[in-house]
Amino acid sequence: MVKLDIHTLAHHLKQERLYVNSEKQLIQRLNADVLKTAEKLYRTAWIAKQQRINLDRLIITSAEASPAECCQHAKILEDTQFVDGYKQLGFQETAYGEFLSRLRENPRLIASSLVAGEKLNQENTQSVIYTVFTSLYGNCIMQEDESYLLQVLRYLIEFELKESDNPRRLLRRGTCAFSILFKLFSEGLFSAKLFLTATLHEPIMQLLVEDEDHLETDPNKLIERFSPAQQEKLFGEKGSDRFRQKVQEMVDSNEAKLVALVNKFIGYLKQNTYCFPHSLRWIVSQMYKTLSCVDRLEVGEVRAMCTDLLLACFICPAVVNPEQYGIISDAPINEVARFNLMQVGRLLQQLAMTGSEEGDPRTKSSLGKFDKSCVAAFLDVVIGGRAVETPPMSSVNLLEGLSRTVVYITYSQLITLVNFMKSVMSGDQLREDRMALDNLLANLPQAKPGKSSSLEMTPYSTPQLSPAATPANKKNRLPIATRSRSRTNVLMDLHMDHEGSAQETIQEVQPEEVLVISLGTGPQLTPGMMSENEVLNMQLSDGGQGDVPVDENKLHGPSNRSNSVSSLDLEGESVSELGAGPSGSNGVEALQLLEHEQATTQDNLDDKLRKFEIRDMMGLTDDRDISETVSETWSTDVLGSDFDPNIDEDRLQEIAGAAAENMLGSLLCLPGSGSVLLDPCTGSTISETTSEAWSVEVLPSDSEAPDLKQEERLQELESCSGLGSTSDDTDVREVSSRPSTPGLSVVSGISATSEDIPNKIEDLRSECSSDFGGKDSVTSPDMDEVTHGAHQLTSPPSQSESLLAMFDPLSSHEGGASAVVRPKVHYARPSHPPPDPPILEGAVGGNEARLPTFGSHILTPAEMEAFKQRHSYPERLVRSRSSDVVSSVRRPMSDPSWNRRPGNEERELPPAAAIGATSLVAAPHSSSSSPSKDSSRGETEERKDSDDEKSDRNRPWWRKRFVSAMPKDDPSPRLSAQAQVAEDILDKYRNAIKRTSPSEGALANYESAEVMGDGESAHDSPRDETLQNISADDLPDSASQAAHPQDSAFSYRDAKKKLRLALCSADSVAFPVLTHSTRNGLPDHTDPEDNEIVCFLKVQIAEAINLQDKNLMAQLQETMRCVCRFDNRTCRKLLASIAEDYRKRAPYIAYLTRCRQGLQTTQAHLERLLQRVLRDKEVANRYFTTVCVRLLLESKEKKIREFIQDFQKLTAADDKTAQVEDFLQFLYGAMAQDVIWQNASEEQLQDAQLAIERSVMNRIFKLAFYPNQDGDILRDQVLHEHIQRLSKVVTANHRALQIPEVYLKEAPWPSAQSEIRTISAYKTPRDKVQCILRMCSTIMNLLSLANEDSVPGADDFVPVLVFVLIKANPPCLLSTVQYISSFYASCLSGEESYWWMQFTAAVEFIKTIDDRK
């Protein structure tokens, strides 16, 4: 058989440790980045929405807000301050947070309150509507908020529109709650912006290119647009037939152009129906469904209302003002274009209403030229959707797991909202919702909350929006619920609240502070920071038992968490990863379930974390605000579910159930099973079969009492928390294994295990596991680590301390006592008896079947123990597991007898077997202490023939368990070692049972008994032999003082733990290969050769001495001391157990990888969301500037008219250029002195100057562009026709162009052609040059794409430019060149100058090409 190579094992373990450390550091950084990005996103979103509301006020220019006030307010908004709510509200913040949270989750109450407020004519109803959108629902950044708001809209349809006498008039007026909320929602919905951009960008740009004339179709209005002189010139003498004929011809021409234009819009509308926002479609279909049931409303009337909602409230506003929606960014829309856009919007609405009696009879002729059903068909598609009750949710929610935990709301908004609700309450308009509102208001303080003097109530009635969403685990499937009570979460809300500041008055120098009020919900779990043991235990629990309570899982997560923020673990993730091996779907499902749970749990967790000041331990202090706000810790951790057992728990259980089988299956085929690492047991490469064994072992860990309640566990944990200081591995393990205990996990220092050793051990695990192919080396290494981790949990202070503690056998042993509660976990892990452990739970019933893959060798006790511990993590599983868990685990194994094994196992076993079972039970406890002991104990047991031992073993395991906690000296020394271990463990369990529940202890006993029995049958003699070999003197001092059996188990676990640390820190050095005969993959214990491990450690000690590394020397020497007491066979079992554990840790590596990927995806999505919000903000600010410029120019209209008259009189180009420049400078000066611009920033002033230039040049465009009028027009027409002829004969490979063949693949460069075709839409010379630059850069990009080996030069570029110009044939080329040369030539420089030179050269070359040749 192949021998296990200690050097290979050390190499893999070191790789694992390095990899895990690296991954955890990266995950820590990613978590911090996600929190910061989320905080920035919500703050920016809050400010952006306030700016948009401020813009609406400016456009309306209502009496309450002058343009100057709006401008000052816009400046103040940029400096919005977000402060924690308690600074303003004091202790009352909690009450207000609860009020806002419950109100937010009751869409029906919100809708009925808004309707009641309108009926009562409340002045601040509109302000409250803004607050609902911006604060309560955080601008709908989170999908959860969007879903709530959609329900509010649905209830408004039912309570407001359905009850109205004339709902259509109410809707058209646009002042009802539904209209305002719909407008806010549709404006902010990103999918709506995508639809509008895809649908309207191209047709609007085409309209701007052709905006020569007003497309007026009313003859009377058409005539009025011309002066008498122009009328006579165009139409002849007024009143004559020729005049009327010419006018009609122009009307017909305009109608034809308008029909073509509208048809283009309709075509794009139909083409892009597929990307119509699902949420808007849902609202429209709900309206149609609800109002169709009203008897007094005809179907046509209902359809007309849906048309109004779609077109009048959504599409047409974007058609008329595309700049406001970001559809058109740099192309100015002049008066002619605006008029034509309004004509298009009007026709679209009329076409949608065809079939109804309405319509202007004068437009009937125009409408007759359209397809009657063109727009109606689009409407049918939107309305035709199935009216499902629940709002649509995105199939891919990249922010899944993230949840909002705070509300951003200003003080004035908060008071207004509360007063509004109170007035509604007293108004008697609420009907059935009155009780719900009464309950909400009952918890609010009667007196107004105190607020700092700095916050004065602002007269502004503008609603302020405050984001209340905090990303918990965005998008990552990491179930990271970011809901936490922490102030950080509040930050998210702050973002939304910025709108509130908009309400400030112009007199305010400082903006009203936005309060960040915690909703009091949300887990505080951090993705990727679960300890190795938690992940493995979760996997085991999920795989082994479907009915594990969700709560326990959640608890496990927290325990992990408290220890280290650095390790961001998602419990959900871990679960998914565990299953990820062969059956990843299970893992994913579990993960999703976990995510769902997490949200609910956050609150409880957060409370607990605060209670134990775990936040500081986690290192969250620095970025506390951010983390809390974002509460990025995502509900990933199962922990969350503990707190909300309802939905999440169900989901988790479903996942666990489904995953239980899938997981086990996947466990059986762990990823990496194909890795080269040899299976220590069989000597063959570790294969998926091994995973089977480990999966079985996992069950044992579940053996913890299934009945144990969380509260009891928490108590246990607290009682054991004292252990934290103890370095007992057993204690640590127990703690870690018990993570399911909520209290325990938090108190002991959640991921202490993973954190302390984890850093080293987990790292190596992950590294090794990937190589070994064992995802879960749950066995001893993990177990050790678990214990270690648990221990660390208890004492999170420093890794080194915990590591040292691990090395201190005495402390470990002693700690074990205090950790009594945790022993349960140990039982699950009695992996140290190699043969027995595998059997543990599964062994008894179907061990043989399963284990066969391992060969005769069953998992080493250490392995078993490790498995158990891992499983124990799923203690939640364990609780029900006494029979259930086992059965579920077994089921995957396909061993029907598994369920009943536990009870009968012990009875069925022969006396020796019974003893084995007992020892096994003890072993779990001691497994952490010393795997070797366990194995030795097993051998000894097998050999034992004494009646006392047999009787002791035969004794029912439950009775053994209840044996006094104090170890009893057995007359027989052999028995004493093993029996004592069992006794000790049982005693601990008894204590735990007393504290928790008898059933729990019983379960643990049964599991251990079962394991022992099975294992014993598998390896009777070896076990007994080992026990005999180990004398009381060999045991650690602490062990010798106690019972020998317990000592041997502890020694084995302890040695395995220490050996793993030694191996993972060893460097490969020259070392002679020792020859050992192996049997069934295990070293033959009869070999007399020197111990391979001891030789290896001696070399490492020599190196440590050489390097003068005192800490390493101490660790290695202690390891050597522990290992020396074992014989060769036990030592090889030790190595095999470590290797098996390594293989089984693969799920932890997968967990870390998945967490990292999830965090990276979340971060990328958050950055994209931030990009969108910043773009929205930029669009709103630029449009705001445009509106202010329009107001300025209106005040200077007289001066502008004088300028135009003077400009017409000039003939020389230089004079014209000078006059334009002088007038622009005059306007710039006037702007600087205008009160509106007093608070403008430098950027705003630059935008304003650009807007002024565009407006002025628009007014004189024709005069400047065609200085010679008809002469210039005819000249352009000649060149246009010439290019048109060339276009028919010139191809990309035409010899006159000489385009290099390598660049012909991208011909005809359509994107560059589309760029230059829009040049007519730009009216200023600067914008036209920019259009040319975009075309040139597009060509260069395409050329670079075609030939990546070289940079295209001018010789490559110019021929392509010529070809693009010929094919695009933009209008007025010559006039464009002349216009730019006259008014912008002096401003050209650098890149602009170069590309302009290339462009003019291309135009000149085109003029010389003879199309006849």
From Swiss-Prot:
The modification Phosphotyrosine is found at residue 460. One of its GO terms (biological process) is regulation of protein transport. The keyword Phosphoprotein applies. The modification Phosphoserine is found at residues 227, 466, 721, 725, 736, 745, 856, 882-883, 888, 894, 946, 972, 999, 1031, 1038. Interacts with TRIP10/CIP4. Interacts with RAB5A. Residues 1273-1413 form the VPS9 domain. Residues 757-768, 871-882, 934-955, 1016-1026 have a biased composition (Basic and acidic residues). Residues 448-474, 540-587, 718-799, 826-852, 871-957, 1011-1049 are annotated as: Disordered. The lineage of its organism: Eukaryota, Metazoa, Chordata, Craniata, Vertebrata. Its main location: membrane. The modification Phosphothreonine is found at residues 390, 458, 470, 741. Keywords: Endocytosis, Endosome, GTPase activation, Guanine-nucleotide releasing factor, Membrane, Phosphoprotein. The record marks 172 as: Arginine finger. This is GTPase-activating protein and VPS9 domain-containing protein 1.
